[in-house]
Amino acid sequence: MSKLIHARYTENGDSGWNGKAQAGDQTGNEVSVTEFYIAPWDFALRYYNWELAKEFVIIAKKLAGCVKVGYDQSQRNDLYKELKAYNFDVDKFILLGKKVETDCSVFIYACLCVLLPNLRSDKNAPTTDDMENFYKNKGFTVLKSGGYLNGKKNITGNIIVRAGHHTAIFQSDVDSVAKYPTEVDSALTIIAQAVLKGTFGNMPERKDKIYRAVQDKVNSLVM
């Protein structure tokens, strides 16, 4: 069964704005791994580097299994701040860090910041309303077809989002990530063979034709 890794709710089953939530995971369910479920997801985000996507999942599962990370929207940026204090060393934070809170979108953002320094910022982290615009120019592809919303086409490391509501990290029950590079290699081989055959010609527009062919292949792989 495919899984979701996500920050879900406080120990009181709410968002935390009433000030009653305590730092850290009080129940083991505030930030946790659950079975994948169908919801009105709006889109998925997929990072272009699949080795990094797998590392992203490993980091998320470490933090989800750590009692130091709980849920509270009113203290949503605290996980990011504490990871920054330990130079984004997750193991050191788990060993030495203080108990903190996060929410669904900052949990994902903080995990990604461990691996992608270019994302790091002390500003308020992106919310589910901001995630599409925030990530789409940072190496992520936005995927909106039905297969990504019901889980059938998602692969490990995809991020699924319901804007204004919730977001989670997808972990497949099959090793889809290992298959994807084979599809990419096959597509590149087809284009390379076309170049060698002179399919794109030798005129100045040759570069544009090759670019369009590559883009068409990319689109076919992610749709």
Indicate residue ranges for each PLM-predicted region:
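Loop/turn positions that initiate beta-strands
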Residues: I155-N158
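Extracytoplasmic Gram-positive cell-surface binding/anchoring modules and repeats
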Residues: D185-L188, L196-K207, Y211
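Short alpha-helix capping/helix-loop boundary micro-motifs
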Residues: F140-K152
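N-terminal capping segments
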Residues: M1-R120, A163-H166, Q171-D173, A178-K179
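Repeat-associated, polar segments at repeat-unit boundaries in modular proteins
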Residues: Y211-M223
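Short, basic/aromatic beta-hairpin or loop at an interaction surface
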Residues: P117-V142
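Solvent-exposed, polar/charged alpha-helical surfaces in well-ordered, non-transmembrane soluble domains
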Residues: I58, S105-A110, T189-Q193, D208, ...
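Acidic, gly/pro-rich intrinsically disordered regions characteristic
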Residues: A178-S186
